[in-house]
């Protein structure tokens, strides 16, 4: 079974309406051998609002404590696999295909009997199956509807929570707050473990009546856990303080709003019940818990906020948080489903000066004209109808001044479509043969007949992206009319689905395509603008004075002032030796010197902030007058800050912004920052992560890390991406990353390849000098494949290698 067949089979199950009860899920799991029975500890989180954020907070805290954690949430933004993650990585396509192939006979048989499991039941079973396979320590489950009859209640939780209760799904859960609260309280764990809840008044009384023992969370006196919102500390974070009987945490969270402090308090209480985590893990976990589309601030000047508020209560919470910002005008983009109380939602939101009513793709979306009438009745200033969410967002941002605030709300579906403005990538693929064309098409899950038919037409410029199904169809029609080609994933039968599209054309055809997309519906104008920028059509590349700009590949020399680095540990830990090495690098043509005070080799000991500063600061101060840029290789924001103060120019973070403060340091000092993809740092030699396609998967995972830096205020041109050769990749995967380095330009910034003396070169049986010869060869290949920077230990031979590659590409000066 191919992935597109498996995904279509799964998504087709949405034709079966939801049904309450756990029996169908239990039967499906029984057909798989009940993988959940001997699985991890389960944490089950129910609630009308806040359950997804609380689940993400809980997962992040437990991971910060060193546990392997599965997370099951809904809905997804772009890909159904987002619902099932292990240690932050979504389920692989191969795993999903294996699961669907396994259950297909069972589901088909049950469907023939008129008792097919529903989409949500199957995805829930898939999550539990995946968590068992991955042998996670804890699985955090977000409840779908209610608690008593939800598919997730097939497990016996060791800890659980009810975040909040509002009137919702009254046809299933009951018509009053107490009835709904009692239903949700059925997630309570067995035994003496109290159910954690932030409910109040009648809801709390009903929860207590059913669950018995409860642990209450809130910001009022008498709560077992006090969670206090201290207000924003910057445009993306807020301070919170959380206090229990014998513990207390003060930290920042990346989700704004008073209600998020309560969610954080619930998560902290759950994590302590589940694993006895310490205060430091709670603080680090909460600050690292990024959750797209939940009052997500995409940047400043103007402030742009995405929030999936989809009912009056959630809209009221958004209004309270928006009130924390100073702004001149409020520009709102609103799209909602037809079964929501639009009047109450509009009344709960702050009154906009200008609102754009729009229609997300799903069939359930309310007509934009209806929403426009609702906001006219609610007293909005100017009311416009722009049906495509992407176009509405573009119009709002275009109208906004630096002092305005743009708010996108009404539905997570609307937010998902809006978010593509920041997450869409166009990956260019080198296609020099029929085999290259076939591989590019197969990676996008084009059907085998389509691959056979189209491969001969792809031996030229090939660009892959993800777009809505209706956008893909339009791209296909327009490119065909221009003489180009466009193949779309076989996963194309679902209304509103995001699908891979591979466009094949000459640059002239791409130029005409962008012109034809301008002014078209469905957000295609924005797709065209992004494509034009990505391909550099009619745009001279911007320059900022960095040595990696233009056709030139810069060489970054590694200067480890450590006793235990994997290649040169101990050689330059004496100050004078380090200075002499730096001077030699500069004489031999290095562009950047990267100074590291902590090793990331397997088994390396952690280094304190003080010790790392003692190692790197004296070196930076002594060599700051060299005519090269200085970089500091560190995982710690405080080391980064002091290094920049001492004269460093660039930050190099091998953890990909694991320290939540790192991105803000880079923004504050206007410093370029290297964001690396790493599974573990230091390297764990036993780590063997699954990749469907290592390049596509690393780009997808780096997209969110790059976006974190951008939201903090670091522009894309200063975010250098490093695919992380050797960090959670096999030798074969390392060579694949090297060969396709140019595809990482899809992320919008320079690309760094760090391959120096890596063990991957042992796979070609040419390691006579611990990989030095192989490193120089790979540097030439990296430069030829589009790398902007190569990071190496040995400067002279690698400078020569990249300059030869440069001369081959651009020509040599006859002088």
Swiss-Prot record:
Q: Which UniProt keywords apply?
A: ATP-binding, Folate biosynthesis, Ligase, Magnesium, Metal-binding, Multifunctional enzyme, Nucleotide-binding, Transferase
In this chain, (7,8-dihydropterin-6-yl)methyl diphosphate is annotated as bound at 600, 633, 652, 722, 758, 791-793
What catalytic activity is recorded?
(6S)-5,6,7,8-tetrahydrofolyl-(gamma-L-Glu)(n) + L-glutamate + ATP = (6S)-5,6,7,8-tetrahydrofolyl-(gamma-L-Glu)(n+1) + ADP + phosphate + H(+); (7,8-dihydropterin-6-yl)methyl diphosphate + 4-aminobenzoate = 7,8-dihydropteroate + diphosphate
Please give the cofactor(s) recorded in the UniProt entry for this protein: Mg(2+)
Asked if the keyword Nucleotide-binding belongs to this entry, the reply reads yes
Pathway note: Cofactor biosynthesis; tetrahydrofolylpolyglutamate biosynthesis; Cofactor biosynthesis; tetrahydrofolate biosynthesis; 7,8-dihydrofolate from 2-amino-4-hydroxy-6-hydroxymethyl-7,8-dihydropteridine diphosphate and 4-aminobenzoate: step 1/2
The Pterin-binding domain extends over 553-803
Region (Folylpolyglutamate synthase) location: 1-416
Q: Where is ATP bound in this sequence?
A: 47-53
Annotated GO MF terms? ATP binding; dihydropteroate synthase activity; metal ion binding; tetrahydrofolylpolyglutamate synthase activity
Q: What is its EC number?
A: 6.3.2.17, 2.5.1.15
One GO term of the biological process aspect: tetrahydrofolate biosynthetic process
**Where do transmembrane segments lie in this chain?**
none
UniProt cross-references to InterPro entries, sorted A to Z? DHP_synth-like, DHP_synth_dom, Dihydropteroate_synth-like_sf, Folylpolyglutamate_synth, Folylpolyglutamate_synth_CS, Mur-like_cat_sf, Mur_ligase_C, Mur_ligase_C_dom_sf
- Quote the Pfam families the UniProt record gives: Mur_ligase_C, Mur_ligase_M, Pterin_bind
Q: Which PROSITE patterns does the protein's record reference?
A: DHPS_1, DHPS_2, FOLYLPOLYGLU_SYNT_2, PTERIN_BINDING
| Residues covered by region (DHPS) | 555-815
Where, by residue number, does Mg(2+) bind? 560
Residues of the signal sequence?
Answer: none
* Role played: Can complement an H.volcanii mutant strain that is thymidine auxotroph because it lacks the two dihydrofolate reductase genes encoded by hdrA and hdrB.
Q: Which family does it belong to?
A: In the N-terminal section; belongs to the folylpolyglutamate synthase family. In the C-terminal section; belongs to the DHPS family.
Protein name, as recorded: Probable bifunctional folylpolyglutamate synthase/dihydropteroate synthase
Q: Which organism is it from?
A: Halobacterium salinarum (strain ATCC 700922 / JCM 11081 / NRC-1) (Halobacterium halobium)
């Amino acid at each position: 079974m191919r992935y597109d067949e498996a995904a279509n089979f799964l998504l087709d199950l949405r034709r079966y309406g939801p049904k309450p009860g756990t029996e169908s899920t239990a039967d499906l799991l029984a057909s798989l051998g009940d993988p959940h029975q001997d699985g991890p500890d389960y944490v089950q989180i129910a609630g009308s609002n806040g359950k997804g954020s609380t689940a993400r907070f809980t997962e992040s805290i437990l991971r910060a404590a060193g546990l392997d954690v599965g997370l099951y949430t809904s809905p997804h933004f772009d890909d159904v696999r987002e619902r099932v993650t292990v240690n932050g990585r979504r389920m692989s396509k191969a795993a999903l295909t294996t699961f669907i192939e396994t259950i297909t006979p069972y589901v088909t048989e049950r469907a023939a009997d008129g008792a097919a499991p529903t989409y949500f039941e199957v995805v829930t079973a898939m999550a539990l199956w995946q968590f068992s396979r991955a042998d996670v320590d804890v699985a955090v489950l977000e409840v779908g509807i209610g608690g008593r009859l939800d598919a997730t209640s097939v497990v016996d939780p060791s800890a659980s929570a009810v975040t909040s209760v509002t009137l919702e799904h009254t046809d299933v859960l009951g018509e009053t707050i107490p009835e709904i609260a009692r239903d949700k309280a059925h997630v309570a764990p067995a035994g003496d473990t109290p159910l954690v809840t932030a409910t109040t008044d009648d809801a709390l009384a009903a929860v207590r009546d059913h669950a018995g023992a409860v642990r209450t969370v809130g910001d009022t006196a008498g709560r077992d856990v006090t969670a206090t919102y201290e207000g924003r500390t910057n445009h993306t974070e807020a301070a919170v303080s959380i206090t229990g009987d014998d513990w207390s945490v003060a930290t920042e969270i990346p989700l704004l709003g008073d209600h998020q402090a309560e969610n954080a308090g619930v998560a902290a209480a759950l994590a302590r019940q589940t694993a006895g985590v310490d205060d430091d893990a709670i603080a680090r976990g909460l600050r690292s818990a990024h959750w797209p589309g939940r009052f997500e601030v995409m940047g400043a000047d103007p402030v742009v906020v995405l929030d999936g508020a989809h009912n009056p209560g959630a809209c009221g919470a958004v209004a309270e948080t928006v009130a924390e910002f100073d702004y001149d005008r409020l520009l709102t983009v609103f799209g909602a489903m037809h079964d929501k109380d639009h009047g109450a939602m509009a009344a709960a939101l702050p009154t906009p000066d200008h609102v754009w009513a729009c229609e997300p793709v799903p069939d359930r979306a309310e007509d934009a004209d209806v929403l426009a009438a609702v906001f006219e009745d609610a007293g909005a200033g100017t009311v416009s109808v722009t049906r495509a969410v992407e176009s509405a967002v573009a119009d709002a941002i275009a109208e906004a001044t630096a002092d305005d605030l743009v708010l996108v709300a009404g539905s997570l579906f609307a937010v998902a479509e809006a978010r593509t403005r920041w997450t869409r990538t166009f990956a260019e693929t080198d296609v020099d043969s029929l085999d290259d064309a076939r591989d590019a098409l197969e990676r996008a899950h084009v059907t085998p007949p389509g691959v056979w038919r189209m491969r001969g037409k792809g031996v030229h410029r090939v660009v892959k992206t993800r777009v809505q199904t209706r956008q893909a169809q339009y791209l296909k029609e327009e490119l065909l009319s221009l003489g180009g080609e466009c193949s779309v994933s076989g996963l194309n039968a679902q209304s509103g689905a995001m699908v891979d599209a591979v466009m094949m054309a000459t640059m002239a055809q791409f130029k005409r395509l962008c012109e034809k997309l301008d002014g078209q519906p469905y957000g295609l104008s924005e797709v065209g603008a992004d494509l034009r920028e990505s391909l550099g059509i009619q745009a001279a590349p911007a320059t900022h004075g960095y040595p990696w700009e233009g056709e030139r590949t810069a060489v970054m020399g590694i200067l480890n002032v450590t006793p235990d680095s994997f290649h040169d540990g101990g050689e330059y830990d004496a100050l004078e030796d380090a200075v002499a090495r730096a001077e030699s690098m500069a004489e031999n043509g290095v562009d950047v010197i990267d100074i590291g005070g902590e090793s990331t080799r397997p088994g390396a000991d952690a280094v304190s902030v003080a010790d790392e500063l003692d190692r790197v600061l004296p070196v930076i101060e002594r060599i700051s007058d060299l005519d090269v840029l200085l970089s500091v290789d560190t995982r710690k924001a405080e080391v980064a800050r002091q290094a920049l103060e001492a004269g460093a120019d660039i930050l190099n973070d091998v953890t990909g912004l694991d320290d939540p403060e790192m991105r803000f340091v880079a923004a504050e000092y206007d410093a370029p920052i290297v964001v690396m993809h790493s599974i573990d740092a230091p390297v764990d030699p036993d780590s063997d992560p699954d990749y469907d396609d290592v390049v596509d998967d690393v780009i997808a995972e780096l997209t969110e890390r790059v976006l974190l830096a951008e939201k903090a205020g670091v522009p894309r041109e200063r975010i250098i991406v490093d695919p992380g050769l050797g960090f959670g990749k096999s030798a074969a995967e390392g060579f694949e990353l090297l060969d396709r380095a140019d595809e990482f330009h899809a992320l919008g910034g320079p690309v760094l390849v760090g391959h120096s003396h890596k063990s991957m070169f042992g796979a070609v049986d040419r390691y006579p000098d611990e990989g030095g010869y192989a490193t120089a060869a790979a540097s030439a290949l990296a430069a030829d494949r589009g790398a902007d920077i190569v990071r190496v230990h040995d400067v002279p031979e690698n400078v020569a290698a990249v300059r030869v590659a440069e001369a081959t590409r651009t020509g040599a000066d006859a002088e």
